[in-house]
C-alpha cells in the first residue's frame, strides 16, 4: 500500500494500517517545518519511505546499501537523499533497546531519517559530518525530548566523529 504527503511517499503493509492516519498527520505537520529549516525551496523528488514488516528483509536492505550487517539496534536509515528505510512498529520493537517503543517513537524515527534526507539535499556538495547530521536529526526530531532519564554526555571527540557513541550524546551536544 502507498500514501503520500507533500514531500514523502510512504510504502506500508497491512501491519501498519491501524496507525497510518496518526503517522500521516504527524508527518504532514512536521515535514514542512524541516523543509523550511533547511530552506529547501526546490525540494526535488519526494522522499520514498518504506516501512518494513519483516526485520530480516530490513537488515538485508541495510546490508545491500551499506555492504555490512547492521547493529542489532538499527531501526532506520536514509540514503541517496531520497530513500528512507524503517521498520513497522511491531518490527521496531524487536530491535535492541526498543521493546517499549510506541507510535510517537516511530513518528520521530521517520522524521529523524527525513532530516538526514533534507540535510543531504541542502548540502549535497559537502562532506558528510556525522556529529552534525546526527545532532540535527536527534534534536529537530525531538527523539529525546520526552525521556525522563537524565543523560550525561559521555563521548570522546573521536567517538563523536566516528559515530561510535550513543545517539543521546549528539542530542546533548546540540541542546
Regions found by a protein language model. Give the residues of each.
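Short capping loops/turns at secondary-structure boundaries
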Residues: 99-103, 107-108, 129-130, 163, ...
Amino acid at each position: 500500500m502507498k500514501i503520500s504527503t507533500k514531500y514523502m511517499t510512504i510504502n506500508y503493509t497491512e501491519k501498519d494500517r491501524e496507525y497510518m492516519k496518526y503517522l500521516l498527520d504527524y508527518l504532514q505537520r512536521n515535514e514542512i517545518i524541516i523543509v523550511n529549516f533547511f530552506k529547501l525551496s526546490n525540494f526535488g523528488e519526494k522522499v520514498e519511505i518504506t516501512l518494513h514488516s519483516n526485520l530480516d528483509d530490513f537488515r538485508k536492505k541495510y546490508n545491500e546499501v551499506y555492504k555490512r550487517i547492521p547493529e542489532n539496534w538499527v531501526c532506520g536509515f536514509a540514503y541517496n537523499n531520497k530513500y528512507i528505510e524503517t521498520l513497522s512498529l511491531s518490527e521496531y520493537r524487536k530491535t535492541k533497546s526498543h521493546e517499549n517503543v510506541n507510535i510517537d517513537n516511530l513518528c520521530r524515527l521517520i522524521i529523524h531519517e527525513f532530516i538526514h534526507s533534507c540535510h543531504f539535499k541542502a548540502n549535497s556538495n559537502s562532506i558528510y559530518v556525522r556529529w552534525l547530521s546526527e545532532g540535527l536529526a536527534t534534536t529537530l526530531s525531538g527523539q529525546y525530548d520526552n525521556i525522563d532519564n537524565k543523560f550525561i554526555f559521555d563521548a570522546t571527540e573521536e567517538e563523536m566523529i566516528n559515530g561510535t557513541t550513543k545517539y543521546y550524546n549528539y542530542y546533548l551536544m546540540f541542546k
